[in-house]
Amino acid sequence: MITIALPKGALLSDSIELFKRIGLDFSSFLDSKNRQLQIIDPTNTAQGLLVRATDVPVYVEYGQAQLGIVGYDLLLEKSPDVAHLADLNFGGCRMSVAVPKTSPYQTPAELPPNGKVASKFVNCAKTYFQQLDLPVEIIPLYGSVELGPITGMSEAIVDLVSTGRTLKENGLVEVETLFHSTARLIAHPLSYRLNLDNLNDLSEQIKNSVSKS
C-alpha cells in the first residue's frame, strides 16, 4: 500500500482535493473533530499521513512515505534527497526580503555589511546574500519573523509572502523577491525507480489531473 505524506496547514485542503480527483479520499483530515494522523483511503489503495509541512520531505526521504506534497520553499531550504515529480500549481507564494517602510535601505544590496536579517528560512537567506556577496548575520526565528525589525533585532527579514497583508499590518514592505513557490509532488527515489505498488501509475494520474485543472 502506498503511503502519502500530507502537509498540515495552508496546502492541506488543496492536496486532499487533488487526491479526491483521482479517487483517493483523505477528507477526514479536514474534520475539526479528527485526531487521527494516519488514515487509510476507503478503497484500501493508499494511506495518508498528516504531518507538519517541514516534516513531509523527511518522511519521503527516509521511505516512510512514498509520495508527499510540499512547498518548493521547503525543498530549497532543506535540500532533501527526494525525486521531484511535478509542480501542482497551487499554494502560490513568494520568498521575499522585507524591511520597515521607514528603513533607509530600499534594496537588499543597501543593507549594511554584517547587518542582521531574521528568517525561518536560514539556508535560503544565506544563499541569497552570499550571491549578493554581502556578509550579513542570519538570525533564525521560527515564530513571527516580522518582530525582528519591529523590535530592532534585525534590519530586514526573509520570509514567505502570500498576500502581503501581514507585512503591511506590521509596517514592512517587500524590497526583493528571491523566488516563487508552489506545492510540489515528491517521491522516495528508490520506490519511484522500482515502481513499488504501482507508484508510477499513481503519480501519472496526479500529473494528468493537474494538467487538466
UniProtKB/Swiss-Prot annotation:
It comes from the Bacteria. Keywords: Amino-acid biosynthesis, ATP-binding, Cytoplasm, Glycosyltransferase, Histidine biosynthesis, Nucleotide-binding, Transferase. SUPFAM superfamilies: Periplasmic binding protein-like II. The keyword Cytoplasm applies. It is found in: Cytoplasm. GO terms for molecular function: ATP binding; ATP phosphoribosyltransferase activity. CDD domains: PBP2_HisGs (cd13595). One of its GO terms (biological process) is L-histidine biosynthetic process. It catalyses: 1-(5-phospho-beta-D-ribosyl)-ATP + diphosphate = 5-phospho-alpha-D-ribose 1-diphosphate + ATP. GO terms for cellular component: cytoplasm. The keyword Mitochondrion does not apply. Pfam families: HisG. Lacks the C-terminal regulatory region which is replaced by HisZ. HAMAP family: HisG_Short. Heteromultimer composed of HisG and HisZ subunits. Belongs to the ATP phosphoribosyltransferase family. Short subfamily. Catalyzes the condensation of ATP and 5-phosphoribose 1-diphosphate to form N'-(5'-phosphoribosyl)-ATP (PR-ATP). Has a crucial role in the pathway because the rate of histidine biosynthesis seems to be controlled primarily by regulation of HisG enzymatic activity. This is ATP phosphoribosyltransferase. It comes from Crocosphaera subtropica (strain ATCC 51142 / BH68) (Cyanothece sp. (strain ATCC 51142)).
